[in-house]
Amino acid sequence: MKLMEVSPLFPCIFLRRVNRFVGLVRIKERIERALITNTGRLNEFMIPGRIGYCTPKAGGKTRYILLGFEDHGKIAIIDTRLQGKAFEKIIEKELLPELEGCRIIKREPRVGESRLDYLLECSKGEIFVETKSAVLREGEYAMYPDCPSVRGQRHIKELIKLARDGKRAMIVFIGALPNVSKFKPYKKGDPKIAELLKEALEAGVEIRALGLHMELSGEIIYRGELGVEI
């Protein structure tokens, strides 16, 4: 199902990652600095010469945002902001049964020592939701994380505490890759997160994974829920 469309969208050639947030790309024979919002290592994508896709941005030290990379004839979305916008469309269109009838009442609610992504109001009460970008591929699996994440550990701990306090809590993994049908944690990336997800499941945290990708035309396509293996 089409969720939204990105325009304008420019193909580019990825040259190198300058730092955590900036990459060099070639667009129409010009070398440009592009914003990278995903703080994962993304080693399977950040390969010199790989075809990426950018959109212009206003202001700042970068003129473009690196949204994704060509993958199996489509686009894997690495941009976490775009993933977030797509997730909000899924909520708005009531495409995730567990969140039917819900609406966002607060973004980045403070919980303990962290800020989670969303607080939603639903017919059966409120729910705290944290989203994570799962763009590491292993066969038909989308995986998270691709490197140690203290922040990710902290977020899962906060969700566990919420669930144990009787509140509804959910973590949603955004498998923004074409041709994946399942999600699992990448234990080599961060063994502690894999352990915490098992603890979260036992504590009552709802764990979901969603499949989406971008077409070369810029259309964001939602493919439904992915199977979850914790």
From Swiss-Prot:
Q: Which gene encodes it?
A: sfsA
Q: Which organism is it from?
A: Pyrococcus furiosus (strain ATCC 43587 / DSM 3638 / JCM 8422 / Vc1)
Write out the similarity annotation: Belongs to the SfsA family.
Highest rank taxon of the organism: Archaea
Protein name, please?
Answer: Sugar fermentation stimulation protein homolog
Q: Which GO terms describe its molecular function?
A: DNA binding
Which Gene3D superfamilies does this chain map to?
2.40.50.580, 3.40.1350.60
InterPro entries given in the database record:
SfsA, SfsA_C, SfsA_N
